[in-house]
């Protein structure tokens, strides 16, 4: 008998059962402000067209008995997920892979403003070189101010509260498949988004800009 995760959640709540949760995660945040990368976005989250501003961030997911890391890239125009990467290491290569995916799938646009927090991955020489190669401008949140990148915070909150099992995943491969399905299918094409007056991000983008975006 196959039982979906949402039914399991409801049954456990009715029976007063609590699942075993993974241990707390200690994620090293930036401790030094980076004045050389200003907050160019400055919470101007409304854009005029796709590929004007992209946002990126990293979160963590329990899989295969340890923490793994998810980097995602969001196009602010309709809050569409356009790139992601998953790895056991929260290094610069992780965020570069997510950026590469977004860049290729969006048709290699130029003059994009890329915004993130002050994580060391986004301030790394490797990542900044990739932005330079793609002719993108960089923007960073002020230190310790999550509201400067709130669209990414909301994306990850939705992923974890609506989709990721509370006990994590048995394997990293299962986590990648499941998270990919949520981000690129459910979140982009099915889930209603308040920012788009109830339209899913990909649907809103196609309606507003039928010749732009990803397939």
Briefly describe each language-model feature range.
Residues 1-215:
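Charged DNA-binding/catalytic regions of mobile-element recombinases
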